[in-house]
Structures are given as structure tokens and as C-alpha cells.
Amino acid sequence: GRAIATAQGMRIGNPELTVVAFVGDGDAMGEGISHLIFAAKRNTNITVVMHNNGVYGLTTGQFTPVSPKGFKGPSTPQGSLEEPLNPVRIMLNVGATFVARAYSAKVKELSDIFLKAMLHKGFSFVEVLQPCVSFNDTYDLYNKNTFFIDKKAESFEEADELAAIKDKIPLGIFYDIDKPTYDDELLKGRNLYTQSLSRDERLGKIQSLLSSL
């Protein structure tokens, strides 16, 4: 989740960059959720790809905010008591202008969604369902229970309704709308990287400021 703050700074610093932040379900929906929500709310022109394996795999299998209720791991040996967050619904409801979900075993569709997300002008979010073969092997679950939605929703309400489906797992692009970006409204055509001052100019301004105090 912390990568999202850095990604926003990179994009604002140099709007000519195409910026993609790769995060996990644990950090994006846990300790970094505030960064994710505000990047979506602002409509910063970046792409966030959230790899969702439903577990903290690097620390041997603890549950995350998106793990299903009843998930058993080192931190929840009796099963998690919490209902999981729905990343797609969260992103829709905080204002993300492009929201999609893909599955790592469906490479062709995954690639197509990645491309469309990166071409979208504004904040784009892609949740990638991917099993953790060591601590949360969900291949069978996803192979049997995922389906692709026919087309993106015509409205926010329709997108939210699709994202709320529980008996199956919808894949595809839920939402894709045009809206002014935070970067454009903030920068108004400027590029802070190419228009930055030289080191001597910066030092001169600092010295001038200090002298005036």
C-alpha cells in the first residue's frame, strides 16, 4: 500500500511518466488502505494492480483483510471471525474511474485488462486473483467459480451491483468513466521535473529565504 503514495508523487513530479504501482492484498487493504482510497478519490492518473492471494504469504500465511471468514492460519488457528473486504466495491464507492478484476490463470484476459487500465486517463484499479500455492491454494475455487461479465456497467449502481455478487466471482471491467484528473487540475500543463530549478538556483532561493528571517 505504501507504494501508492510514491506512485502519486512520481506522476505529479513528472506527468509524462506512465506510473503503475504493484501492491498486495495485505498492504493495500490493510496498512496502506488510506493511500489507496485517497489516490482513487483524487483520481490521480496512475494504475494500481493489487495482487490478491488472500494471505500474507511472505510471513507464512496469516489472514489479510480480504481473507474469507473462517480462514485458518498462524494468526487465526480457530478461523477468522471477520467478514472480508470487497476491494472492487471499495474502489467503486470512493470514486475510482476504472475498476476491474482479473484472474492470473486467464492470461489473455488479464493482459487485455492491464492494457486498458494503463491507457485509461485517471485512477485505474485492477484486482488480480492469484492463488498462493504454499498457504492458500485457490486454483480449484477460482476455476469453478469465476465468470466474465459481458460488458462494463452502464452506471455506478449497475457496477456496484455486479461487484456485490457473492455466489460467483465476476471478472472483467466493472467501471470505466472519464473525469478530470487530479494531476491536470493541479499542474495545469506544468512539468515539475523538466521545469525544475538547478541546484545553484535552489540554494540561492534558500539562502534568500533564510536571510529574510
Residue positions per predicted region:
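Short acidic, glycine/serine/threonine-rich loops at helix termini
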Residues: 31-35, 41, 58-63, 136-141, ...
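Active-site glycine- and acidic-residue-rich loops that bind
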Residues: 27-30, 102-111, 154-156
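Conserved thiamine diphosphate
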Residues: 16, 64-117
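Structural motif
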Residues: 17-21, 45-49, 89, 97-100, ...
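Flexible, low-complexity linker and terminal segments
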Residues: 132-213
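Active-site rim beta-loop-alpha module in soluble metabolic enzymes
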Residues: 94-103, 121, 125-133, 139
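Thiamine diphosphate
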Residues: 1-57
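Short acidic/glycine-rich loop or secondary-structure boundary segments that cap or lie
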Residues: 57-58, 108-110, 126, 133-138, ...
